[in-house]
Structures are given as C-alpha cells and as structure tokens.
Amino acid sequence: MTLFISIRYLLEFFLFKIIIFLLFPFSKKMSSKIISKSFMFLGKLSKYNQIAKNNCKIVFPDLNEKEITKIINNSWQNLGHNLFELTFLKKLLKDKHKIEIKGLEVLEKIKKENFPVIFFSIHSSNWEVCVPFLDQNNFKTGAIYRHINNFFFNRYIYKQRTDALKTNDSFYTPKGKVSAKEILEGVINSKNIFLLVDQKDSAGTEVNFFGKKVKTQTGFLKIARKYKLKLIPMKNIRLPNNKL
C-alpha cells in the first residue's frame, strides 16, 4: 500500500470522525436523517448509482424510472442510517423500543434441538444487529465478513461489532482461508454460522441470476451437507421512525 493511499484513508476516517463530532449536539433522530440524506446525495453522484439503476431494471422490468429512483434513494439512505447506527450499536441493541423481534418461537425450537445451524440473511435494514442479537439470545455464533480496504474504517467497524457482543463465545472473522478454518472449528465446537449471502463474488460457483451469469459462494452449503446443519433465514426490515 502506497503512502498516498494510507494518507487518503486516514483523511477519510478523520473526516468521518469530525462529522460525527459535529452531530453530537443534535438528537440521534436528526443526526441519522442528516447522514442518510447526505449518503443519498453523494450516492447519486457515484458510478454505483447507475449500476443500481441497471440492476433494478433487470429485476423490476415493469417499474418506471420514478419508482426505480425511489428504490435506489431509499437504499442510499438506509446505508446512511446504518453507518450512523454503527456508532452506537451496543446502545441500539439495548433499546427495546427500537428493535421488534418476530419468530422467537423458531429460536426456542432451535435451542431445544441443541445443534448448530446456519443463519443467513442479506444486506437489508441494519444487518449489523443480527449477530449481536443471536449472541444475546445464547446462540454462540461465528460470522464471516468482508474487510474494508480502508483499514482505519475496518478496524473501527470491527471494534463496534465486537463491543456489541454480550459474550466471548461469538466472533467475527474476515473472509478468506482463516475464516474457513475458524468457521469449521466453530461448527465442530457447536457454534452457529451467520452469513450475508447477497454480494457479488469474483470466485465461486457460476449460477443463472435473473438471466445473468454470476458467481456466488456455495462453501456454506457444503458445510451444511457435511455436518447436516439446518439453514435458517433471517429477515431484517427498517420500520417507520427507524425502528428495526
């Protein structure tokens, strides 16, 4: 990594910390709104906005331009809400008025079976609450994540995630050879797996997705077959007033 890139990463992270500091006098509701609107504005200027439009047209061919724009704008705003909520993730999880849980009876059934499972979800709403929630409900869980190129942000996000865990039995591991080893060891030691499975991958099995050839990871399916693990979907949505 060049010195220029390292300095750029440091400045990006420093700018983020300054923005969070400047938002301190405002309420969490107002701060979250400011960050989300900023994300939407900046997102529209990025190359990813056009990529999102093209993808939406493939997935939702019957929607008009206005409807597609609304979906994308909401997505950018959700990312902004997520980033801000990450700054107080531990407190967010303790706020019973902010998070509504449905399907606890399913978790109780899994507990009674006393056998590890694979929880899977996608990057929707605030996906960061999933692993700490499982951990708080006595599910020892290992989660795989993709590291961020900016190591200052990567270290910060990792700390926020681990600080939100109630026990030392759950863990986060970066995608790669190390994570494969740690996840397998976790399963052998009766720990569950949590995965977000909606990201495009440069490696893996080629599948047909909305008429397009894409690659996706299927390693977790091989683990599920080998160890006879159940696959448990988790749905996470953002409600009005940023409740989850």
Region roles according to the model:
Residues 1-121, 126, 156-160:
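Membrane-anchoring hydrophobic helices of lipid-metabolizing enzymes
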